[in-house]
């Protein structure tokens, strides 16, 4: 298996789809990575030689992906919580951030219903 950015890339998939297994690489970025490395989008990973995979690694390294991106996102959320702004408070309380109603909805964010103890 080819390893790019510390992730095992599925070899039986096309290059554009396989690169999206990396956290932080979506469809648009995957196409630009393939174009920058000179890889056809419909080429399967197992058909690529080691030099081409190295080119893909170099293209992926230009972006913030995987652990660095996860750390960046978590630090951004932590900063909001430390500031005590509205979004930070909503993060701390595990409630929706963007003005959605919470009286009847928001079950995903709030978790399962808790029964009222008598």
Swiss-Prot record:
Subunit note: Part of the 30S ribosomal subunit. Forms a loose heterodimer with protein S19. Forms two bridges to the 50S subunit in the 70S ribosome.
PANTHER family listed in its UniProt record: 30S RIBOSOMAL PROTEIN S13/40S RIBOSOMAL PROTEIN S18 (PTHR10871), SMALL RIBOSOMAL SUBUNIT PROTEIN US13M (PTHR10871:SF1)
UniProtKB keywords: Ribonucleoprotein, Ribosomal protein, RNA-binding, rRNA-binding, tRNA-binding
Pfam family, one: Ribosomal_S13
Gene Ontology biological process terms in this record: translation
One MF annotation (Gene Ontology) recorded for this entry: rRNA binding
Entry similarity comment: Belongs to the universal ribosomal protein uS13 family.
PROSITE patterns per the UniProt record, alphabetical: RIBOSOMAL_S13_1, RIBOSOMAL_S13_2
Region span, Disordered: 94-118
Functional description taken from the UniProt entry: Located at the top of the head of the 30S subunit, it contacts several helices of the 16S rRNA. In the 70S ribosome it contacts the 23S rRNA (bridge B1a) and protein L5 of the 50S subunit (bridge B1b), connecting the 2 subunits; these bridges are implicated in subunit movement. Contacts the tRNAs in the A and P-sites.
Organism the protein comes from: Alteromonas mediterranea (strain DSM 17117 / CIP 110805 / LMG 28347 / Deep ecotype)
Identification of the protein by name: Small ribosomal subunit protein uS13
A GO cellular component annotation in the UniProt record: small ribosomal subunit
Origin: domain of life: Bacteria
Cited InterPro entries: Rbsml_uS13_C, Ribosomal_uS13, Ribosomal_uS13-like_H2TH, Ribosomal_uS13_bac-type, Ribosomal_uS13_CS
